[in-house]
Amino acid sequence: MADFEDRVSDEEKVRIAAKFITHAPPGEFNEVFNDVRLLLNNDNLLREGAAHAFAQYNMDQFTPVKIEGYEDQVLITEHGDLGNSRFLDPRNKISFKFDHLRKEASDPQPEEVDGSLKSWRESCDSALRAYVKDHYSNGFCTVYAKNIDGQQTIIACIESHQFQPKNFWNGRWRSEWKFTITPPTAQVVGVLKIQVHYYEDGNVQLVSHKDVQDSVTVSNEAQTAKEFIKIIEHAENEYQTAISENYQTMSDTTFKALRRQLPVTRTKIDWNKILSYKIGKEMQNA
């Protein structure tokens, strides 16, 4: 082990550690971090060298965070990244400091937002919040309005998770939707992601994503937001249905084919006989 450590540079160790961290299953960041910490055995190197991995993980996972003094949770995403570990909460018009290791928010400060897109963002945010409340038992969303390459763009992010470590599984749903405000119609682009980890008596992961394209009629803010949500609802329902159907098919065919129909002896086991033999033997020994 010592020879191996001598041959591997600190840079390579950090690269490997960062890879483990960015691929941590949802809800298991701390477990992976602690394991990597033991393997690396150098806290300073890990914190300094892999800090970008901590940030990337939280942004990729749409990590929700509660800001003290504010009711709604906000998602940590690349769209809200202001640099220097500060992030935007467009709903409350504030920025805040985010600790990527502790996953805690602090130092909320007022933040200027694009006033020309205020009504568009608020209409989409209001419609999306109602949708998420109806469809996700533990869901959160954040809507951004930005100028990207000179185009006024709405970006909607959704996150929902269920962490059940006592039952040996964790899962997260993420979706991201964009459209540009370009009347009379605009292209809607979305990506849907599901990641589930089940690890009781085994280690099984579901990692799935789907890209979606559609178009929305751009009229006034409220009507466009309504049509935008209809597209999201249809695509997400369709995706969830397809996932369920695929699992049923796999259960009926693929997984069934993996199971051995008969033991190696090619003879079915008569469990009742085995039980009677065992009882008889125990009675003999009594």
Curated annotation (Swiss-Prot):
Single GO MF descriptor: actin filament binding
Compartment(s): Cytoplasm, Cytoskeleton
Residue numbers bearing the N6-acetyllysine modification: K19, K97
Keywords, sorted A to Z: Acetylation, Actin capping, Actin-binding, Cytoplasm, Cytoskeleton, Phosphoprotein
N-acetylalanine: residues carrying this PTM: A2
Top-level division of the source organism's lineage: Eukaryota
Keyword Acetylation applies: yes
GO terms under cellular component: cortical cytoskeleton; F-actin capping protein complex
Entry-linked Pfam families: F-actin_cap_A
InterPro entries: CapZ_alpha, CapZ_alpha/beta, CapZ_alpha/beta_2, CapZ_alpha_1, F-actin_cap_asu_CS
Main function: F-actin-capping proteins bind in a Ca(2+)-independent manner to the fast growing ends of actin filaments (barbed end) thereby blocking the exchange of subunits at these ends. Unlike other capping proteins (such as gelsolin and severin), these proteins do not sever actin filaments. May play a role in the formation of epithelial cell junctions. Forms, with CAPZB, the barbed end of the fast growing ends of actin filaments in the dynactin complex and stabilizes dynactin structure.
Binding partners and assembly: Component of the F-actin capping complex, composed of a heterodimer of an alpha and a beta subunit. Subunit of dynactin, a multiprotein complex part of a tripartite complex with dynein and a adapter, such as BICDL1, BICD2 or HOOK3. The dynactin complex is built around ACTR1A/ACTB filament and consists of an actin-related filament composed of a shoulder domain, a pointed end and a barbed end. Its length is defined by its flexible shoulder domain. The soulder is composed of 2 DCTN1 subunits, 4 DCTN2 and 2 DCTN3.
Family: Belongs to the F-actin-capping protein alpha subunit family.
Annotated protein name in UniProt: F-actin-capping protein subunit alpha-1
